[in-house]
Amino acid sequence: MASPPRHGPPGPASGDGPNLNNNNNNNNHSVRKCGYLRKQKHGHKRFFVLRGPGAGGDEATAGGGSAPQPPRLEYYESEKKWRSKAGAPKRVIALDCCLNINKRADAKHKYLIALYTKDEYFAVAAENEQEQEGWYRALTDLVSEGRAAAGDAPPAAAPAASCSASLPGALGGSAGAAGAEDSYGLVAPATAAYREVWQVNLKPKGLGQSKNLTGVYRLCLSARTIGFVKLNCEQPSVTLQLMNIRRCGHSDSFFFIEVGRSAVTGPGELWMQADDSVVAQNIHETILEAMKALKELFEFRPRSKSQSSGSSATHPISVPGARRHHHLVNLPPSQTGLVRRSRTDSLAATPPAAKCSSCRVRTASEGDGGAAAGAAAAGARPVSVAGSPLSPGPVRAPLSRSHTLSGGCGGRGSKVALLPAGGALQHSRSMSMPVAHSPPAATSPGSLSSSSGHGSGSYPPPPGPHPPLPHPLHHGPGQRPSSGSASASGSPSDPGFMSLDEYGSSPGDLRAFCSHRSNTPESIAETPPARDGGGGGEFYGYMTMDRPLSHCGRSYRRVSGDAAQDLDRGLRKRTYSLTTPARQRPVPQPSSASLDEYTLMRATFSGSAGRLCPSCPASSPKVAYHPYPEDYGDIEIGSHRSSSSNLGADDGYMPMTPGAALAGSGSGSCRSDDYMPMSPASVSAPKQILQPRAAAAAAAAVPSAGPAGPAPTSAAGRTFPASGGGYKASSPAESSPEDSGYMRMWCGSKLSMEHADGKLLPNGDYLNVSPSDAVTTGTPPDFFSAALHPGGEPLRGVPGCCYSSLPRSYKAPYTCGGDSDQYVLMSSPVGRILEEERLEPQATPGPSQAASAFGAGPTQPPHPVVPSPVRPSGGRPEGFLGQRGRAVRPTRLSLEGLPSLPSMHEYPLPPEPKSPGEYINIDFGEPGARLSPPAPPLLASAASSSSLLSASSPASSLGSGTPGTSSDSRQRSPLSDYMNLDFSSPKSPKPGAPSGHPVGSLDGLLSPEASSPYPPLPPRPSASPSSSLQPPPPPPAPGELYRLPPASAVATAQGPGAASSLSSDTGDNGDYTEMAFGVAATPPQPIAAPPKPEAARVASPTSGVKRLSLMEQVSGVEAFLQASQPPDPHRGAKVIRADPQGGRRRHSSETFSSTTTVTPVSPSFAHNPKRHNSASVENVSLRKSSEGGVGVGPGGGDEPPTSPRQLQPAPPLAPQGRPWTPGQPGGLVGCPGSGGSPMRRETSAGFQNGLNYIAIDVREEPGLPPQPQPPPPPLPQPGDKSSWGRTRSLGGLISAVGVGSTGGGCGGPGPGALPPANTYASIDFLSHHLKEATIVKE
């Protein structure tokens, strides 16, 4: 406002002598005070005249009259000139344009009175404090009178609440009541009264430079903010919340403020220069005092719970504790930006009719309106922010901080009378104290508050007439007071910007019972829950962040379609702590001003219908709630499909509690489980994990298949849906394979649990991180899939822990069903799985036939129980593999994935991050069966790399396809970082075994010609009576690498039905290290060990470590035996170390030890000198040894043969067993009752290195006599060791299955002989005779 024009020439002097201290004897009736004061800058005395509003004073009269003049301060050169009216005043300062009037002091003057206008700063110095006070009081009184005369504020507001003057027009037309705090706001008008104002010069340093805040500004301090008002500007350029100030200080004449990240400017410092050091110190002290006062105010009530904001300029704040107030009209966040709701303790204010329905009155406490003591009239209750009405009570009244009474909006403009609360109450904030539940209060029609205060979207009144409020504090039973909030705060710099209840609730909001809601967000558990009456299964007022109770395991759903359009707007919403009446809520009206700016985040689900695990009510401190639709759009976040409010909606939350399995109730009710339980420990028994696949072909194979099969139940008793969301269940027992929006994380694109309709993953938005399937069907490996009932009902088992995190993402060239299988499955590249190869070409026998064929005998239950690590292979319908050409179980090693050590169940540890090379494939194959060279899988030659990939490997994401088909020619990603150990024994099959049951050497079991990707080895002379018709070629030198023949030769040499095109692409083998251990008919040779004296080998720092030696006399399967040894605490897994010699390729990270010997590593932590952190398996060594009476053949010397063919077959000696001794840790996992010690990470040598371990379970089959192995039949018959082939490599779950018909060495033939699987893979090396395993004790 411009200064008034200078007056005309003064009239003649009155002749009265000057009266410096009593100036009012002047004839000028408008003069309030006059006297001599000094100017600040130079100290010159001038005669000052303070005039009130009038017609221009005597000067105007003398000049013939003029327009009315505002209050002003004039000064003349002397009193004589003023009295003589000899000239115009030297200067006139209009008081109505002053930002503030303050008492000041500087280095020169102790008693200053400073006037700050928008364009200048003017200060005068009094002689003493009394004179200063007199002038200051006169100035401030005049300002207050002018404000009252202008009608800008009620006269009662005139006295200043602090030392700052209440200036006219402070509220710019607000109807609020007063005090200096009326004007506290994020964006305060220039006419607002500030507590303190200083003129400072912002320096181009820190934020001043980055935010272009330089030059002369007014530093304006209010109760909660400081603003920088540039000269000639009406509004502050920057307003900082006092709560955002990290620290402040002054040095000399400089004052600086450091603000945090929540400030509008961002973090940084603002440096400003005051007139002198005294002013700088005064600024510092004053701001510190204001900050302390604010801190003390909010210490009474935690910041995180203060939830309200006075609505804009319409709500005066009469409590000094208020954080801030908004002074702009309510703008949507799209215009004002995301700003945090302010916390205000405003008494009552009513939004003017002009604000219409988009303004909402907010109370200081959201959902917590306590009645002030003075307001506790009969039934009178202050309204809480979201309208949670609370019964007033003496207990709550003293603590009440909700003094804003929500008045009518929407043009009704019914003003709410100010609540005459005591001063103490005005400063108090309501704590969360128990209050009696009372009926909802009526809201003035049309204003429901968004608890954020960012936008004032409000619901219009429900249709129909709305009677006026009979009393400002009285509300009808059907309505609930709403809180209107101003969304003018333009920045998230509001103090308490990160309060907890910003994001949905105060800490105790939701702690009510199911179907109950605490009316007060701040009352923890003491507040009686309000029964939600007509919510239709919705709980109003608070969003439950808990997972809904679900009966069908379908816990969470996506946003319902009707709310999809509001999603984008909902994203702007920062806080979801919405509160609405528990009874009725006004009908939403999309046309309300800022309703479209928000979406209603609804968590609707009825009762426990959305409960994920009805039997686990204690999974969260919070239980079921009902949604609180407020002024947001309609995002349904938790509506169960069976929910009465929104069916088919999907809540976007996932259960994070371990062990909460999705209860399966069919695919119809649980179709879109988008999220997965993340608990690795909720693992079913291994039999659940190892369920055989249930495919359409298998279902067709068994005529008795019926749709009425029982739902699968895990060992834990959980049932699993046949369909579910797309996130994978990290725990083997939990998942819903039905894809709904996200790509499946387990191995095939089409899960077996999905129905035979072949529904593939609909979208490729997320990459399938599971091993890609080897077959086009895309069904996951067996241990992921469901088992098939003999009746043909595919068990809808839940996929187990799939290998979703391999060391590197190998882009498989072949994607199953369109899935982008980006991770390689560590499948055995050396051949098909034993059982699959035998059974694949075979017709599906009856359940009993399958059981007997697997050696389980009639004792095998018809229901194919999921195999435990040593389950008999009976009970698996052979048609599974025969018709689908798939491996039974992936031959992979996922050291982190599937818990498979039965005795490790008590020690589930989270998987460590993988490093390349942590997957080791150990293939115990007999060259006499199908491997052209004794150890073909050695990837020494790039040309042989593709041949090594077993097409039958079920989960080979390397691109292997169905065996016998051209899909085998797919290129595969390089098998880098992996190590393949092939224990190929040239030993011939043992005579005496029925031709239909090839038992004995692994390769005989693993390599029927029809299915083997490798051609049978050429016959070689063998003096052994047990030599096969097709003797294998001479074994290689131990540790010597073999190169496969060209793929064409391999394919040509293969028998009928073999894979016709093993891809001959010489893909990069990367760092895949193959260790072939060709065990000749001679005594065992050291694996991958150069000639070294036995003493040198044994004499290592790891003395006392037991070495597991594979003897040549036994076939690969029989090489490992299990005896009933007592537990050995030091029996830890041994890291397999690849020998760098022989052309083996090692990963650059030296995943495997570079030692030239397979040095055993002591399980003691002190004895692991050669351990590498990335090693995953500990030393398993084939030792050359003549112990046990084993004869030494030509190749049995210390010096390994120089050529793979150099070894001549030696007559195998009679197997001589070496009894296990208690100190011999041959098997890490003992059978139940066999005294095997559990493998523990604590006892493992690599425990401190974060290694994953493999338990090598050496099992004994004393009842099974050696049986000769006939030539591989076209249709191999299952044998005793039939299922061992699936575990010949350290696959993802290496559990040796298939015990002889006469009883297993561990647990008997029945399934589930071992305890449930746990987090570590176990290798069960079953063997017939204990004598055939040699354990060298150092």
Curated annotation (Swiss-Prot):
Main function: Signaling adapter protein that participates in the signal transduction from two prominent receptor tyrosine kinases, insulin receptor/INSR and insulin-like growth factor I receptor/IGF1R. Plays therefore an important role in development, growth, glucose homeostasis as well as lipid metabolism. Upon phosphorylation by the insulin receptor, functions as a signaling scaffold that propagates insulin action through binding to SH2 domain-containing proteins including the p85 regulatory subunit of PI3K, NCK1, NCK2, GRB2 or SHP2.
Segments forming domain PH: 16-144
Oligomer and partners: Interacts with PHIP. Interacts with SH2B1; this interaction enhances leptin-induced activation of the PI3-kinase pathway. Interacts with GRB2. Interacts with PIK3R1. Interacts with DVL2; this interaction promotes the Wnt/beta-catenin signaling pathway.
Sequence motif YXXM motif 5, residues: 742-745
Organism encoding this protein: Homo sapiens
Name of the protein described by the UniProt record: Insulin receptor substrate 2
Compositionally biased spans, kind Gly residues: 53-66, 1188-1198, 1224-1236
Main location: cytoplasm
Gene3D superfamilies: Pleckstrin-homology domain (PH domain)/Phosphotyrosine-binding domain (PTB)
IRS-type PTB domain span: 194-298
Motif extent (YXXM motif 2): 598-601
Motif (YXXM motif 3): 653-656
Pro residues biased stretches: 1-12, 459-471, 859-870, 1013-1022, 1083-1093, 1263-1277
Native organism taxonomy: Eukaryota, Metazoa, Chordata, Craniata, Vertebrata
UniProt cross-references to PROSITE patterns, sorted A to Z: IRS_PTB, PH_DOMAIN
Placement of sequence motif YXXM motif 4: 675-678
Annotated positions of the Phosphotyrosine modification: Y540, Y653, Y675, Y919, Y978, Y1253
GO annotation (BP), single: negative regulation of long-chain fatty acid import across plasma membrane
Entry-annotated residues carrying Phosphothreonine: T350, T520, T527, T579, T580, T779, T1082, T1159
